[in-house]
Amino acid sequence: MTDQELYDRAVAAAKRAYAPYSNYFVGAAVLTMDGHVIEGVNVENAAYPLGVCAETSALSRAVAEGYRPGDLEAIAITASPCGGCRQRLHEFRLGRVTYEHRGELVTRTADELLPDTWDFE
């Protein structure tokens, strides 16, 4: 699957996001090493800190389906990932992270997005 095809899946997922407060709908699509695509969306809450980003939603679904760090090949997101999500993407060792930035698709590695990540090593 190309990065563009994965991004198109994220765009389709974004239409299902729950964003009644900001009206900012975000979708994410994770490509697993065995070729499955797992989608996630942002889910807002009236108590703003309790909302969930699309990347977190997709990664949580992947974990619930039995995937672990190293099992995921790529992710596409309809927005630039926040700092917390960059840490999560690094944790799962995403080789390719594609997102829209200022109207263009950008592809980076998780290491490029967060070069000095925190970990236990």
What does each model-identified segment do?
Residues 52-71:
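Short, charged low-complexity linear segments at domain edges
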Residues 34-45, 67-68:
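Glycine/charged-rich beta-loop-alpha catalytic/anionic-binding loops adjacent to active sites
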